[in-house]
Design a protein with these regions (language model features):
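Hydrophobic alpha-helical core bundles mediating ligand binding, dimerization, or RNAP-core interactions
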Residues: 30, 44-47, 67, 86-90, ...
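Asp-based, Mg2+/Mn2+-dependent phosphohydrolase catalytic module
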Residues: 2-9, 104-107, 116, 120-121, ...
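Active-site neighborhood of HAD-like aspartate-dependent phosphohydrolases
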Residues: 2-48, 75
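A metal-dependent, Asp-based hydrolase signature
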Residues: 37, 51-85
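Short, acidic loop-to-helix structural element flanking the phosphoryl-transfer center
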Residues: 64-65, 83-115, 125, 153
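Alpha-helical elements of Rossmann-like donor-binding domains used by nucleotide-donor carbohydrate transfer enzymes
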Residues: 28-29, 42, 69-73, 85, ...
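Hydrophobic side chains within well-formed alpha-helices
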Residues: 26, 39-40, 82, 133-136
Length: 226
């Protein structure tokens, strides 16, 4: 074990959707309603785009509201009840296989764990519980608390406040390059796992640590010199 005084990172904050949890349940629900297998990507990409656009104009809407709006455009043949079922599937996500080993590795080193989501804290807490991960996570933080979406600096700084730690002692881990870029711009240490995007977009600030999966990333973060 590395002593805290010798380690750069004292806490790791994880993105939630796609970083910790798979979207298979949402995809399966869409396909069950006759949607094409590509609909999930169209929906999720549009949802992020719409959320970022609202953020750029200083407007905030909770996850359920803009997700429903984005889904109505991406899959216009779905009725209200079907859209509701698709959105409910966000509460049935399963964890990626590398999540628990990564959490166990951090706990073995005494590194605190938090989750930072653009969704709701309640749903995230339920996902952690249903996947037997809740005991690892000290705090679940939602952008709802400050009504500003990642990747603006405010959510990452809010996480620092909740953890009562300076930016240089906290790492943000995600599978989205835009998320690690946002965290780095806010002063946090960053780790990016390539299992979703494959290649890190060159327009973004590079992460401090990168790896194929979460275990490799957290190992790299633990190894960072103070």
């Amino acid at each position: 074990m590395v002593m805290s005084g010798m380690r750069r990172v004292d806490a790791v904050v994880f993105d939630v959707v796609e970083t910790l949890f798979r979207l298979d349940a949402v995809a399966d629900t869409l396909i069950g309603f006759g949607q094409d297998s590509s609909t999930l990507d169209v929906f999720f990409t549009r949802m992020l785009r719409d959320a970022f656009a609202l953020g750029c104009t200083g407007t905030y809407r909770p996850f359920a509201e803009f997700a429903d709006s984005s889904l109505a455009v991406a899959a216009p043949t779905l009725d209200d009840a079907q859209r509701g079922a698709v959105l409910s599937a966000f509460g049935e996500l399963t964890a990626h296989s590398d999540v628990q080993p990564a959490f166990e590795r951090l706990r073995s080193e005494g590194v605190r764990i938090a989750a930072l989501t653009n969704g709701s804290a309640t749903n995230t807490a339920r996902l952690l519980d249903r996947n037997d991960l809740a005991s690892f996570v000290e705090v679940v933080i939602s952008v709802d608390e400050i009504q500003v979406w990642k990747p603006k600096p405010a959510p990452y700084r809010h996480a620092l406040t909740r953890l009562d730690l300076p930016a240089g002692r906290v790492a943000m881990v995600a599978v989205h390059a835009w998320d690690t870029h946002g965290a780095r711009a806010a002063g946090l240490v960053t780790g990016w796992a390539s299992r979703l995007e494959g290649v890190y977009a060159a327009v973004f600030d590079p992460p401090d640590v990168r790896g194929a999966g979460l275990v490799e990333v957290v190992d790299g973060l633990i190894a960072l010199a103070a």
